[in-house]
């Protein structure tokens, strides 16, 4: 690099998948310059061994394992262990992991009073973020990141308690009594009964639904340095506690452009249905650069190819609709929209393929979830990724995150007394 007649050299960092980056840690010290990269499109904030994503080739791997293989063969808690601890668990390790999570599924009864304080009309993600942060009050001892046993207990506690709290958010909204974990059942089966079981009836587990939800949560497990994950790492870099950091991730995930996208997909489909169900009209609106309408659930900030997660969850979505025998015009519109967009040269040339949000929203709606609850399920899936990234950041000794800026406000000016303004 040449600046003001001087030449500067900066090292190239190469990742294990041959990704290359310019290390500019000494840029300001040497030149007085900083870089400006709105939205961090070209900025790597860290080195990470958790997730590899190649948007050009449509590749997603957790700790080296292809997402397609994990979704087909693994259980969600196996993948959670993999993300957090770096390796797939042995049978003995996996049994202990599940037992320890079971041990922590009871939530302090005072949390019920906190939940009672939220109005039923409150947005579920706001309640989840607040309640997750409140868990800090019941777990005040900071996690000793240098003690493997302490970290392990904190990880299991976070997975257990945030899952329970998420179900309470749903049940409060629906006016149902709060539910508790059944240690005789698996994790995915428990999520379904925690949310949907009612006291007067036996909840029957549908294996097709269990399989689809297991896949969906695995696909949501981690996605490199996205908005919510980067938020968790940034908040955690101040040595904020695990629950506080997770709560910040929940808040970031809440946004319509991040985790809220699956809700936006269903809202779009309902808008099309209310207009008469004519897909072509809305396809043309999406093509019109002067029209504010945006086709939700298509394209991705990172993937320039088909989202590998979408291929998997499309099959699961079809399985769920068939298993439940649902005849909803919304799903017919979704299939028509998908077909038209996949065949239309406008969308093909711009790599606007259906993404994971397009299909996940369909599954959540088929399960009977209220629109505003979709992102709560997303948060349960993303929880292991947040924990893994927080753990990696804390144990890696990363400095506190402190981005810089280019100031574009007023230059120095004198204060004007009130009576002279």
PLM feature spans:
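Non-transmembrane, aqueous-exposed alpha-helical and coiled segments at domain scale
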Residues: 1-421
